UniProtKB/Swiss-Prot annotation:
InterPro entries listed in its UniProt record: P-loop_NTPase (IPR027417), RecF/RecN/SMC_N (IPR003395)
Name recorded for this polypeptide: Uncharacterized protein 094L
Pfam family, any one: SMC_N
Family recorded in the similarity comment: Belongs to the IIV-6 050L family.
Length: 829
């Protein structure tokens, strides 16, 4: 079995190998991760642990890979993914978990001692074991839901039947209605259906409505024509020359408006010109000479800044050369010390090895033979091989009975050896294919004998090999090679990366230093570069401001030169006279437009009167048509009255049918209630049987737990007589759930488990854990500090009992103090 951990609690990356079907002790100092290994196996198989945080610190995810026989299991957290490969098939997530439960059992998933649980929690725990293959709770819920549905349906049916019975007292058979007479209908409508009669009525109503609408429209048009003639009399005659007068006035107004707009624009331009003239006087002190002087001052500051920067770079280069020389001397001294120290280590290892300086290949060969022999023996179970040899040898004997004395004998079919029939068991069989079976058994027996010889040879090799001494000597050989390699690497001095980079920088700047020293003397600076740059910034700002002022002055001079003469000679009196003349023309134009509106109104009314007269002529109104339609409508109403009586007669027939259907539905509801009541009684009986079956399964589980506890506790408590612990299932009345109570008989007294000592309590808890692990079918048994409170002798007896109880399972035990000899393998962290 191979376990690989990545970012799981205290393990960033680790791999552990465990032998199958054997017992492994995991020991080591506290905090080294012993319990984490068991937790990782539980996480890989079942995905649930009692720990909330399983991811390593400052990591975002973890991964556990478990290889067990044909299984390859990988479970990750963030993302939560389970992947299982078994016999060439791949399974994932829920499907993979089902496969793991089938082959590795289920886990109790309970971090609390069984006796510390409440009655409800104990029952839930035992129910999970008893009902592992079937969800009894879901079945009971379905039965309960079905009973609730039946009760609700019965209540609904009872209500319906009661309501129907009450309604039956009020619902009476309808009174008979005579069939209507068709002869009362007009002969032209007698053969028509109700829809046809209604269609005739709609057509008649539409025609009558059209005649009424035509009459109303004729009256409305007459009234509108009278109103128009009255308005024309009030407006009087129309003036046809008003249009020419309006055109003349509009031309005058347009000319005066253009003149007024031009004068207003000249006025605004005159105000802007005066403002620009006043602003121009502010730039009298700005000139080209002043700008040139500022430019020369900025160039002087630039030259001073360049000289200061070059001087600072030269000083910095001198400081770096001094630092490089000091670092070179320091690193050479450290290199000599490390070389001397490595030579001392090599001499010390040579002294420990002694005269045999070249025996490394022989030591490696002997260690390899030892570990190969140990691995071969751990992979083969010696008791199982012996038992198989005994069984094969027993199968080689065939029973023969003497026909004269009836004496039973056994004949070895391979060697023809004869022995008494009472010596040992008879496992041979007769029938077809016996010869082939005997050949296979002889061949298998030879293989087992060869395998036993190899195992005995390996035991002899392991006994004659001092593995600890050889391992220590092999480590010395390896340390010697490591030190020699380190000395070979340190033969030549290599400067550090920072020193090499500093020397490269100095070599790169040598040409710059020579050129700078030839032009500038290396003297202290009178003024810093920052101060010079601040002065330059101030001078540049003043230069930019002066350039902006000079540009603004030129712009104002150009703008003043482009103003027209009308702006220069603008007159306020001429502007006011033009506005007064425009106001007079606008008033006259408004009066003429009112006169034009009156003329248009007269023309519009005359056109409307002519249109109304045309509509009256087209209407062609005739009052006799309305009387004819009224007479036709009365005949149609008589026919519709006949059809109304027909509808009433049909309603009577429908009510009679409903009355008959009501009584039929009442009889059907009573029949359905009888059938549903029978189904309800059957379901109640089934629910009672489910509860009884569940109780019997719990009794069976408790009996199995008691039998396992009895066997374990007799070995865990050798000084106790009788059964130390027994679980009894007590039932309350039918409407409550059964409860579990535990009684402890220890040394002839009935006591509470909390009054036991720490060691006694640990043994009781271990017995419960092993019992549930065996019942749940766990393939890998994991025990974490289960004997921490027990002495060495009792711990040894308990571990021997555990090993004998689970001979064909992989057992992982975490313990600080235990006899390592009783375990097949020991893993020290």
């Amino acid at each position: 079995m191979k376990l690989t951990l990545k970012n799981f609690k205290c393990y960033t990356s680790a791999t552990f190998n465990f032998a199958l079907d054997s017992t492994t002790l995991i020991t080591g100092p506290s905090g080294q991760g012993k319990s984490t290994i068991l937790l990782a196996v539980q996480f890989a198989l079942f995905g649930m642990t009692g720990h909330r945080y399983v991811i390593s610190h400052n990591k975002s995810s973890c991964e556990v890979v478990l290889e067990y026989r044909d299984f390859w299991i990988k479970r990750t957290k963030r993302p939560n993914v389970l992947l299982v490969r078994w016999k060439g098939q791949a399974y994932q997530d829920d499907e993979a978990q089902v496969v793991l439960h089938r082959w590795f059992g289920t886990t109790a998933n309970c971090s609390t001692f069984f006796l510390d649980l409440s009655h409800v929690e104990k029952m839930e725990f035992l129910e999970r074991i008893a009902n592992a293959t079937y969800n009894v709770g879901e079945l009971k819920a379905r039965v309960k839901a079905h009973l609730s549905t039946l009760s609700r349906d019965l209540a609904v049916l009872d209500g319906q039947i009661a309501t129907s019975n009450e309604m039956a007292a009020f619902v009476e058979k309808p009174d008979p209605i005579p069939e209507p007479n068709r002869d009362l209908v007009e002969e032209s409508l007698r053969d028509a259906t109700q829809e046809q009669v209604e269609e005739v009525r709609r057509q008649t109503l539409r025609l009558r409505s059209c005649e009424v609408e035509k009459s109303n429209k004729h009256a409305t048009l007459q009234a509108q024509r009278g109103e128009i003639e009255h308005e024309l009399r009030l407006l009087g005659p129309a003036n046809d020359t008003v249009a020419t007068q309006i055109a003349t006035l509009e031309e005058s107004v347009a000319r005066l408006k253009a003149q007024a707009d031009q004068l207003q624009a000249d006025k605004e331009a005159r105000i802007l010109m005066e403002d620009q003239s006043s602003r121009l006087t502010q730039y009298d002190s700005v000139s080209e000479a002043a700008v040139s002087e500022r430019v020369e001052r900025v160039e002087q500051l630039n030259r001073a800044i360049a000289d200061a920067v070059t001087m600072e770079q030269l000083w910095e280069l001198d400081r770096e050369q001094q630092t490089a020389a000091r670092l070179l001397e320091q690193e050479r001294h450290e290199w000599r010390e490390r070389l001397d120290q490595a030579q001392v280590e090599l001499d010390h290892i040579a002294a420990e090895l002694g005269p045999d300086q070249d025996g490394c290949p022989e030591v490696e060969q002997r260690c390899h033979e030892y570990w190969h022999a140990k691995s071969f023996n751990s992979d083969h179970n010696l008791p199982q091989l012996k038992e198989e040899m005994v069984q094969i040898r027993a199968r080689l004997y065939k029973p023969i009975c003497c026909t004269q004395c009836h004496h039973k004998m056994l004949v070895n079919m391979a060697t023809w050896e004869v022995k008494d029939g009472d010596d040992g068991p008879i496992c041979a069989t007769t029938g077809s294919g016996e010869k082939g079976r005997l050949q296979a058994d002889r061949k298998r027996l030879q293989q087992l004998e060869t395998l036993m010889g190899q195992i005995n040879h390996n035991e002899a090799v392991m006994a004659s090999t001092p593995i600890d001494e050889l391992t220590a000597r092999l480590q010395l050989y390896r340390d010697r090679e490591t030190v020699r390699e380190r000395i070979r690497q340190m033969q030549t001095f290599q400067p550090s990366a920072s020193l090499a980079a500093l020397e490269h920088k100095i070599k790169t700047n040598v040409h710059f230093k020579r050129k700078s020293k030839s032009t500038i003397a290396l003297v202290p600076l009178l003024e810093s570069v920052e101060s010079l740059r601040e002065r330059k910034c101030t001078a540049v700002v003043q230069l930019d401001l002066m350039k902006q002022q000079l540009a603004a002055k030129d712009k104002l001079e150009r703008q003043l030169a482009h103003y027209p003469s009308s702006v220069v000679h603008y007159s306020e009196e001429a502007h006011r006279s033009s506005l007064d003349e425009l106001e007079v023309c606008v008033g006259q134009l408004a009066d003429k437009r009112l006169e034009a509106d009156r003329v248009r109104t007269i023309r519009r009314l005359e056109a409307k009167r002519a249109k109304l007269q045309t509509k009256l002529d087209e209407l062609n109104h005739c009052p006799e048509d309305l009387t004819r339609h009224e007479s036709k409508l009365r005949e149609v109403n008589v026919a519709l009255e006949y059809w109304a009586r027909v509808t009433e007669y049909q309603s009577y027939c429908a009510r009679l049918d409903k009355w008959n259907q009501f009584h039929a539905s009442l009889r059907d509801a009573r029949d359905r209630r009888e059938r549903m009541e029978k189904q309800y009684r059957t379901t109640v009986t089934f629910s009672r049987m489910v509860c009884e079956a569940e109780h019997e399964s719990l009794q069976c589980v408790v009996s199995v737990v008691n039998s396992h506890l009895e066997i374990l506790l007799q070995d865990f408590f050798p000084d106790c007589c009788g059964d130390p612990i027994q679980i009894q299932l007590e039932l309350c009345h039918d409407k409550q759930r059964p409860q579990v109570s535990a009684t402890i008989n220890y040394k002839g007294n009935r006591v509470d488990y909390k009054s036991l000592s720490t060691g006694e309590y640990a043994r009781v808890k271990l017995a419960f854990d092993l019992t549930f692990k065996e019942i749940l079918g766990e393939t890998i048994i994991m025990l974490d500090e289960c004997t921490a409170n027990l002495d060495q002798d009792l711990s040894t007896k308990i571990f021997q009992k555990i090993i004998s109880t689970f001979p064909s399972k992989t057992i992982l035990v975490v313990a600080h103090q235990a006899v390592a000899g009783i375990f097949n393998h020991v893993l020290t962290l």
